[in-house]
Amino acid sequence: MMSKIVLVGLVGSAAAFNAPMMTVRRDAIATGAAAAVVAPILRPAGAAMKKNSKAPCVTIFDERDGCGGPTRAKTGAGEEGLMVKIQMQEIKLGRGAGAEYVSIFTNYDKKLFGVK
């Protein structure tokens, strides 16, 4: 008996949430167009596009090959000569931004002035 009551309740709730078939396609399209016009007006002020283009920039300092750095005692907790710096910087895009990246990437392992 309980299962029949649950079944009738489920069928009744499904019938209550059934979409009405009285709407015409033109009314649905008009409603969608009106919503598209009103949506930018209702957007919160915090959702506006930011004018500055800042991104996290990662700089890796690798001095494991030896340099005249600090002379304190080594702690033994990881790589002593390796440091990572993360900083928010403004990214300026221009015509040569892609070419500059390719130049840095391709020259990474090349010897400069006879020093590797």
Swiss-Prot record:
What is the designated name of this protein? Answer: Phycoerythrin alpha-3 subunit
Gene Ontology terms: biological process: photosynthesis
InterPro entries the record matches: Globular_prot_asu/bsu (IPR011070), Phycoerythr-like_a_sf (IPR037011), Phycoerythr_a (IPR004228)
Q: Where in the cell is it found?
A: Plastid, Chloroplast thylakoid membrane
Describe PTMs of this protein: Contains three phycoerythrobilin chromophores with binding mediated by both the alpha and beta subunits.
Main localization, broad class: plastid
Q: What does this protein do?
A: Light-harvesting photosynthetic tetrapyrrole chromophore-protein from the phycobiliprotein complex.
Keyword annotations for this protein, in alphabetical order, are: Bile pigment, Chloroplast, Chromophore, Electron transport, Membrane, Photosynthesis, Plastid, Thylakoid, Transport
Residues the entry annotates as binding (2R,3E)-phycoerythrobilin 2: E63, C67, K85
Q: Which residues bind (2R,3E)-phycoerythrobilin 1?
A: S53
UniProt keyword annotation of 4Fe-4S present: no
Family listed: Belongs to the phycoerythrin family.
Q: How does it sit in the membrane?
A: Peripheral membrane protein
Query: Which residues take part in binding (2R,3E)-phycoerythrobilin 3?
Result: R64
Q: Could you give the subunit structure recorded for this chain?
A: Heterotetramer of 2 different alpha chains and 2 identical beta chains which form 2 alpha-beta heterodimers within the heterotetramer. The two alpha-beta heterodimers are rotated to an open configuration in contrast to the closed configuration found in other cryptophyte species due to the insertion of a single amino acid, Asp-65, in a conserved region of the alpha chain. In the open form, the central chromophores are not in physical contact but are separated by a water-filled channel.
Q: What's in the misc comment field?
A: The light-harvesting system in Cryptophytes contains phycobiliprotein complexes. Unusually they are composed of either phycoerythrin (CPE) or phycocyanin (CPC) but never allophycocyanin (APC), with only one type of biliprotein being present in any one species. Unlike cyanobacteria or red algae these proteins are not arranged into higher-order phycobilisome complexes, and they are found in the thylakoid lumen.
Plastid: is it a keyword of this entry? yes
Q: Name one GO cellular component term.
A: chloroplast thylakoid membrane
Q: Which domain of life is it from?
A: Eukaryota
